[in-house]
C-alpha cells in the first residue's frame, strides 16, 4: 500500500524541531524505504550559514517552500573558477547539475525541500572550503555518501576542530566555519 501524501505545512507544525544545526535537515523519504526507493527527500530549515561547499556526483533539485535562500555555486568550467550566487525565492524551483560545488545559505524562518537520487556505488561526494581572501581551495574531504545527515556533520566538525585544515596554503588566512553576520545578504522573498 502506498503512503499518503505529505502535507508539508502540517508536517512543519508538528516536526520543525527536527531541523537542527549544524545541518538543519530531516529526511522525509529515504531510498532504503520500499515505497520511495531511488530518492532522498529532505526538508531543510534555516538558519544555515556554514561556509562549506558540497560536491554531489548527482543532480540536486531544490524547492523553496518558505522565504528565500541563496545558493552559492562555483563554475569550474572557467579559469579561474567563477563564484556565482543564485537566489532561490519562495515558491521557486532550481535544478543543480551534478558535480557543481554549492553552498546552500538558508536564513532564519525559511524552509526548503531538496531531492537527491542515490549515488552510484563507486561515486564520491566532496566537502570543500574556499578561501574568503584569494578563492583558493583551503581543504576538502571526499567520501562515499551513504548517510548525508551524519557524514556531512562529521566532516564539518572535523574541519571546525582543526586550525591547520582551516588555514589557506596560498595566502595564510584562516577560513571560518560560518559566515559572519552581514557577510551574506538574504535575497527578497520574491523576485524583483
From Swiss-Prot:
<keyword id="KW-0963">Cytoplasm</keyword>
<dbReference type="GO" id="GO:0000334">
    <property type="term" value="F:3-hydroxyanthranilate 3,4-dioxygenase activity"/>
</dbReference>
<feature type="binding site">
    <location>
        <position position="116"/>
    </location>
    <ligand>
        <name>substrate</name>
    </ligand>
</feature>
<feature type="binding site">
    <location>
        <position position="54"/>
    </location>
    <ligand>
        <name>Fe cation</name>
    </ligand>
</feature>
<dbReference type="GO" id="GO:0008198">
    <property type="term" value="F:ferrous iron binding"/>
</dbReference>
<comment type="similarity">
    <text>Belongs to the 3-HAO family.</text>
</comment>
<dbReference type="InterPro" id="IPR011051">
    <property type="entry name" value="RmlC_Cupin_sf"/>
</dbReference>
<keyword id="KW-0408">Iron</keyword>
<comment type="function">
    <text>Catalyzes the oxidative ring opening of 3-hydroxyanthranilate to 2-amino-3-carboxymuconate semialdehyde, which spontaneously cyclizes to quinolinate.</text>
</comment>
<feature type="binding site">
    <location>
        <position position="131"/>
    </location>
    <ligand>
        <name>a divalent metal cation</name>
    </ligand>
</feature>
<dbReference type="GO" id="GO:0005737">
    <property type="term" value="C:cytoplasm"/>
</dbReference>
<dbReference type="GO" id="GO:0019805">
    <property type="term" value="P:quinolinate biosynthetic process"/>
</dbReference>
<feature type="binding site">
    <location>
        <position position="134"/>
    </location>
    <ligand>
        <name>a divalent metal cation</name>
    </ligand>
</feature>
<protein>
    <recommendedName>
        <fullName>3-hydroxyanthranilate 3,4-dioxygenase</fullName>
        <ecNumber>1.13.11.6</ecNumber>
    </recommendedName>
</protein>
<keyword id="KW-0662">Pyridine nucleotide biosynthesis</keyword>
<dbReference type="GO" id="GO:0034354">
    <property type="term" value="P:'de novo' NAD biosynthetic process from L-tryptophan"/>
</dbReference>
<dbReference type="InterPro" id="IPR014710">
    <property type="entry name" value="RmlC-like_jellyroll"/>
</dbReference>
<feature type="binding site">
    <location>
        <position position="171"/>
    </location>
    <ligand>
        <name>a divalent metal cation</name>
    </ligand>
</feature>
<keyword id="KW-0223">Dioxygenase</keyword>
<keyword id="KW-0479">Metal-binding</keyword>
<feature type="binding site">
    <location>
        <position position="50"/>
    </location>
    <ligand>
        <name>O2</name>
    </ligand>
</feature>
<dbReference type="GO" id="GO:0043420">
    <property type="term" value="P:anthranilate metabolic process"/>
</dbReference>
<dbReference type="Pfam" id="PF06052">
    <property type="entry name" value="3-HAO"/>
</dbReference>
<feature type="binding site">
    <location>
        <position position="168"/>
    </location>
    <ligand>
        <name>a divalent metal cation</name>
    </ligand>
</feature>
<keyword id="KW-0560">Oxidoreductase</keyword>
<feature type="binding site">
    <location>
        <position position="106"/>
    </location>
    <ligand>
        <name>substrate</name>
    </ligand>
</feature>
<dbReference type="GO" id="GO:0006569">
    <property type="term" value="P:L-tryptophan catabolic process"/>
</dbReference>
<feature type="binding site">
    <location>
        <position position="60"/>
    </location>
    <ligand>
        <name>Fe cation</name>
    </ligand>
</feature>
<feature type="binding site">
    <location>
        <position position="60"/>
    </location>
    <ligand>
        <name>substrate</name>
    </ligand>
</feature>
<feature type="binding site">
    <location>
        <position position="102"/>
    </location>
    <ligand>
        <name>Fe cation</name>
    </ligand>
</feature>
<comment type="pathway">
    <text>Cofactor biosynthesis; NAD(+) biosynthesis; quinolinate from L-kynurenine: step 3/3.</text>
</comment>
<dbReference type="InterPro" id="IPR010329">
    <property type="entry name" value="3hydroanth_dOase"/>
</dbReference>
